[in-house]
């Protein structure tokens, strides 16, 4: 299957302008092929994009004497240790009588043995012995006796698996560059969401963050006045573009730098207020309390004037602020890079992986980063903050026949356009 490596950059302004305001909802029959509408949504596979590398499991979770079962893109896989100790993957179902290999044992180095009749496979899926029939079994070498093997690669302690039918693409195309950088410290964790991968990934860069995350520790410690402006924005938000046919990024990441005032630039973010008045609600204010307003002012001042100036950590435009195929969202905090990758499990569930990347210069700094991640950051960002996303996304009804978009939905809609027209294995009508 052809791999689109050099798709020309394409502006997504059309997808953004196709997202009408709430006062002017889209019209037409469900399934009409309009940018960002159900026509695009219906072209995105429910079980995921097959021709890609996906994060699958932390290497430390795979023991040496047994396999671990994991469902990915609707396929049952078994992960176990190969002959060199690295993690490998086969189809979980024994081709003999469809027993689960994950319930077997690794009796011999680099192999896994079926618990039913003792059929033993190596890391390439080749049937090497049939313990139930004995050493002279004629089953070995028979056509169809081997199990399907899935290519794997372990990077920074995380196992990635190729789920495609074609020869694997270069893993560097699908996995963030820090996984190949010896200087980078990449800490990761994962959760299982009871949601299809599409809404799990589309839960980014729209107006939900201001409301859903308003009481998260992450937002409370930020310049929330700036976040108010940033997360409410529709047409004022910077336009996006497609880079190398693989990534949807913002054209102007300087917009997201809340430290502009340190360099003498008076920004709209600096003038924003966290609390707003809603005339249609009788001039009610939200957030409701003055305490939140004052907290926003204090945190805004501290972050704009006391936080040291830092450079962006990501210099590769393809992997800058935005989303990268197949399912990796990126945000550069300048102290670290936050990434969230979604691996489809089945039609109803997804694995969500979180990456925290930093570049500590000393052993002590690396030790501190690991400790901070273990006792604080992982909870703050991936449970307290993203747990709010999880709670909302799990109750969505994604397949309803109608969606009424707002201009602030431009980024998720542009991602649909990226997948439908640029991803490997998705047919263009």
Where are these regions (language model features)?
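A short, structural micro-pattern
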Residues: 50, 146, 153-155, 336, ...
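C-terminal catalytic domain of Rieske-type non-heme iron oxygenases
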Residues: 4, 9-13, 86, 167-429
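Rieske [2Fe-2S] iron-sulfur-binding domain
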Residues: 2-27, 32, 41, 57-186, ...
């Amino acid at each position: 299957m052809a791999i689109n490596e050099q798709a020309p950059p394409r502006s997504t302004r059309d997808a953004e302008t196709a997202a009408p305001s709430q006062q002017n909802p889209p019209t037409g029959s469900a399934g009409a092929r309009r940018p960002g509408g159900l026509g695009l949504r219906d072209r995105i596979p429910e079980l995921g994009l097959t021709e890609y590398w996906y994060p699958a499991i932390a290497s430390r979770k795979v023991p040496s004497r047994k396999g671990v079962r994991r469902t990915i893109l609707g396929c049952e896989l078994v992960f176990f240790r190969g002959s060199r100790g690295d993690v490998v993957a086969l189809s979980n179902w024994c081709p003999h009588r469809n027993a689960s290999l994950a319930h077997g044992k690794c009796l011999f180095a680099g192999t896994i043995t079926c618990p039913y009749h003792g059929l033993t496979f190596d890391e390439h899926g080749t049937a090497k012995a049939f313990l139930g029939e004995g050493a002279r079994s004629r089953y070995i070498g028979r056509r169809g006796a081997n199990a399907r093997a899935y290519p794997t690669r372990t990077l920074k302690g995380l196992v990635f698996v190729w789920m495609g039918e074609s020869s694997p693409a270069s893993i560097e195309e699908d996995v963030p560059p820090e996984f190949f950088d010896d200087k980078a410290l990449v800490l990761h964790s994962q959760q299982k969401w009871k949601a299809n991968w599409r809404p799990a990934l589309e839960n980014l860069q729209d107006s939900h963050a201001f409301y859903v995350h308003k009481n998260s520790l992450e937002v409370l410690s930020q310049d929330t006045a700036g976040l108010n402006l940033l997360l409410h924005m529709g047409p004022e938000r910077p336009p996006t573009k497609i880079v190398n046919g693989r990534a949807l990024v913002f054209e102007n990441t300087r917009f997201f730098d809340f430290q502009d005032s340190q360099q003498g630039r008076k920004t709209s973010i600096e003038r924003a207020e966290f609390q707003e008045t809603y005339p249609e609600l009788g001039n009610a204010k939200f957030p409701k309390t003055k305490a939140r307003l004052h907290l926003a002012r204090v945190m805004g001042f501290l972050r704009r004037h006391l936080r040291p100036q830092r450079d962006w950590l990501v210099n590769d435009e393809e992997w800058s602020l935005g989303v990268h195929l197949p399912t990796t969202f990126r945000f550069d905090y300048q102290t670290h890079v936050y990434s969230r990758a979604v691996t489809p499990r089945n039609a109803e569930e997804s694995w969500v992986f979180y990456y925290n990347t930093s570049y500590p210069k000393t052993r002590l700094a690396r030790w501190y980063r690991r400790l901070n991640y273990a006792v604080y950051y992982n909870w703050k960002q991936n449970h307290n903050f993203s747990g709010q996303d999880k709670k909302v996304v799990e109750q969505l009804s994604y397949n309803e026949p109608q969606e009424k978009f707002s201009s602030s939905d431009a980024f998720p809609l542009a991602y649909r356009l990226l997948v439908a027209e640029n991803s490997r294995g998705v047919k263009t009508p």
